[in-house]
């Protein structure tokens, strides 16, 4: 019996660091996504206020592309959370495509299409930050989810 208890204790001690490491990694992924959201919000606000039709910057989406699949595989998000976060980052990626297109129009010297693309990008940016047609912002619900995931106590993951 003594040997069994020692074996069981050894087994438990061997797996405890892995559990804590998993929780630390999940929280780190959430922090990376939140940092990216904050940076994106700053850039979207600049896009709306600066009136530069083809800026050189793009909204960062690397952490989302890298970390979110890991969080999905770990079962760290619900379907509703996936939808809200996905809509937010999908809009960010749409804005990036619009900025790429505006940059091409700038290179070609097509000011008419450049201005139209800038207007579209501003509409997308407004929808991201403030919502459209009476709907809520895409940014705030996603940020609330991410903030709630970060604030979860380490033993609850």
Named regions from a protein language model:
Residues 14, 21, 28, 73-76, ...:
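Primarily heptad-repeat coiled-coil rod domains in cytosolic scaffolding/tethering proteins
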Residues 15, 29-31, 118:
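Histidine (H) residue identity feature
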């Amino acid at each position: 019996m003594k040997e069994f208890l020692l074996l069981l204790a050894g087994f438990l001690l061997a797996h405890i660091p892995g559990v804590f490491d998993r929780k630390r990694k999940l929280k780190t992924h959430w922090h990376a996504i939140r940092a990216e959201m904050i940076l994106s919000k700053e850039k979207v606000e600049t896009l709306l206020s600066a009136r530069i039709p083809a800026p050189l910057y793009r909204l960062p989406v690397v952490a989302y592309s890298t970390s979110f699949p890991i969080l999905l595989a770990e079962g760290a998000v619900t379907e509703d959370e996936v939808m809200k976060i996905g809509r937010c980052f999908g809009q960010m990626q749409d804005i990036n495509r619009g900025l790429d297109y505006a940059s091409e129009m700038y290179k070609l010297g097509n000011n008419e299409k450049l201005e139209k693309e800038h207007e579209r990008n501003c509409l997308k940016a407004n929808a991201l930050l403030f919502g459209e047609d009476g709907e809520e912002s895409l940014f705030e619900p996603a940020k609330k989810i991410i903030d709630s995931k970060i604030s979860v106590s380490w033993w609850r993951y």
